[in-house]
Regions:
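Short amphipathic alpha-helix with an adjacent loop that forms part of the alpha/beta core around
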Residues: 68-76
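Short glycine-cluster motifs
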Residues: 76-135
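Short active-site oxyanion
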Residues: 29-35, 107-109, 158-159
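Beta-strand/loop-alpha-helix module characteristic of Rossmann-like adenine-cofactor folds
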Residues: 2-6, 119-181
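Alpha-helix capping/helix-boundary segments
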Residues: 41-43, 117, 167
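Glycine-rich, flexible N-terminal cofactor/catalytic loop recognition
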Residues: 1-62
């Protein structure tokens, strides 16, 4: 058992295979005082597999300021983990304002690296990846998505976008529509 420095630990979680988590991440999850996560029900699958029982706070874009206020009394005197449902926290996930709040208060923040769907997709793409741009999720509005596609066409580097599984076909059709020239 190692005593953790008080502050915020941004811990990457597995993308699909629960065994893809580092020993360091497991050790820190075992030792933190509580865990901030997107979906407690989802996070419990991983935590139960690891035999970890901790208090969970749910964090979303719409409640981030509320969570920041709820944990103010713990900042600086607790070790707190932030995890996402899958992959690296803050990569198209909530948590930016939380991290900024810790940094602005000069409270320790560190990243525990691990799975990243952005990096995995780049590695498997067969495209040059020494220079790339990540755009996050495709905008919901078709006009905004079309603008993004046009912007990507103008770039001469590999680009990564997130598209929810149910929307891939529609997005590919939009790419074809915007690529006729």
């Amino acid at each position: 058992m190692v005593e953790l420095k008080k502050g915020l630990y941004l811990i990457s979680t597995p993308i699909g295979n629960l065994e893809d988590i580092s020993l360091r991440a497991i050790n820190i999850l075992q030792e933190v005082d509580f865990i901030i996560c997107e979906n407690p029900k989802h996070s419990l699958k991983l935590l139960n597999k690891l035999g970890i029982k901790k208090k969970l706070f749910s964090l979303h874009d719409y409640n981030e300021d509320i969570v920041i206020n709820r944990i103010k009394k713990y900042q600086g005197n607790s070790a707190i983990a932030l995890i996402s449902d899958a992959g690296s926290p803050l990569i198209s996930d909530p948590g930016f304002r939380l991290v900024k709040d810790f940094i602005n208060k000069n409270i320790f923040v560190t990243s525990i690296p691990g799975a990243s769907s952005v990096v995995s997709s780049l590695q498997l793409s067969g495209l040059p990846i020494n220079n790339f741009v990540f755009f996050g999720f495709v905008p919901k509005k078709q006009s905004s998505a079309s603008l993004l596609i046009k912007r990507i066409k103008e770039l001469n580097i590999t680009c990564v976008v997130f598209v929810p599984g149910k929307k891939i076909k529609k997005f590919l059709e939009l790419i074809m529509k915007n690529s006729k020239d």
